[in-house]
Amino acid sequence: MTRILSYNILVGGKRRVDQLTNIISSAQPDIVGLVEANNPRVVEEIAQRLGMQYRMSGSYTQAYNWQNALLSRLPIIETHVHNHPDILTKPFLEVCIEEADGRKLTVFITHLASAFYRSRGGDGQRQREVQAILRIMASKRGTPHLLMGDFNAIAPGDQLKASALLRYLIKMDQLYRRNPHQHLGYPNLDSVIPERLHFLYPFLETIAHNKVLCALLDKAGSVYTSRGSISMLRKAGYIDCFRLKNPKDPGFTCPAGSLAGRIDYIFASPDLAERLAASYVVTEGNGISGDEASDHLPIVAEFGECIEGVNGPVHGLTTTGPLT
């Protein structure tokens, strides 16, 4: 069995190495995809603690130099970094891994644009990124491969708890005003709410604490949220691992401190999806809650031959969804 974990570690994770390592190690992954892996020293430290090799999509130049990284217990065969700054907002990392049984598995790690403040314009940008990603991955058709990372998008049919997101954004704005340096990189109201709706700011506290208004906000959020980028991947034949194994579980991954939506995914090629044994979200590990480590929760997918007893629960790990 090969266990894969995808995790946005929030602006490099410099002050949270212990927490991140505890969360990751609790899942006992063979391959780890890290998003916002901006600091090579942090990636190296986590890799050393986990006994893994690592590859990065680029070098460190500044705190917001968004990078992806891959950690692996398994042999790394080759690595490619795809840079298309005219389309892709962050480098696209491709790593070929040799699984324990000798099979080759190509892993792609992405971090799509957020641009939530642009509303449907943001989803249009993500769709252009997905088009570029599909072109890159076309060479792997017919071979096992997967795409994972932070897609900053809600899947068709998924819930969005806009009221939970609003309460989180209000809280983070307040914390940022008190201590800007400590909360750099966390989402805030301006990064999510379109400018044309900024006139609502004086009323947000009232909305966030009114049950009727929250219910209306959740309904509106689910109806008007753009879902085109995830729909494109599904139409291209890629399998949403978590949703395949958990048809009814929301599987929220973000924000970890006030779960509102599922924006982190592991997509498998059809041939690889035939080996999918389980997929789940890690909410706690080794006594560390998810929101202590990052503003995202990690997602796991397990691939094997589905032999009875192989895919049982891992000790020290708390998840959402059944470990099927």
Predicted regions and their residues:
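N-terminal, active-site-proximal structural segment of metallo-dependent hydrolase catalytic domains
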Residues: M1-R49, M56, Y60-N68, G261, ...
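Active-site beta-strand/loop signature of hydrolases that rely on acidic residues for catalysis
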Residues: R3-I9, L20-V43, V95, V107-F108, ...
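Short, flexible loop segments at the rims of nucleotide/cofactor-binding pockets, characterized by
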Residues: N8-G13, L34, N83-H84, G121-R126, ...
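Soluble or luminal CAZymes and related metallo-dependent hydrolases
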Residues: G12-Q19, I87-T89, G124-A132, G221-T225, ...
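A shared catalytic/ligand-binding motif for oxyanion handling
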Residues: I31, E36, L93-A113, R118-S119, ...
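Metal-dependent phosphoester-hydrolase catalytic domains
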Residues: V81-N83, S139-K140, A153-T324
